[in-house]
């Protein structure tokens, strides 16, 4: 069969998004309207435009996990403020929470670009590379999936230069890799850029892969093919 194209009216301007845990619903940021547009790909229709309560949502692909109160959820951070918005995604098992913002977590600051978790991890990681506060640009925030009301559980400063951006888990879900944006002019100082490998359980740095010029997205093939995030 030839592929078909379905035009679905949503919101402005669609940029970055990912699947819910069932791979039926696609959630995408409408960053000019501070909303997440949710598409039912089975019925090929818009389910909802959810107000995120933040400014300029930027989820990357977002993060999926099962909350003890709200059931399956998906989350996004924001460029314009410190809000992490959590949206229910289970219309069958938790209809009262589905396609609504069910909770917020306060990040360290504005300037978040990516949020990441893994089914085998208890943590959700957020970056702040375009924060107005320089110290936060190289600091990751971590919160507990089972206790979102507890807010940020721990912070981890991963470099003394540049900006920390885009976390990615390994296949096992026990390491998280983060890029450091550096500067080519500082290559002789070892500050052109690198990837930092972190132990997810202990939240400590295991190793560094140095001398990379502004590495950004890193995608584990196993996780990416299966939309694990």
Q: Which residue ranges define each predicted feature?
A:
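Predominantly soluble domains enriched in secretory-pathway, periplasmic, or organellar proteins
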Residues: 1-229
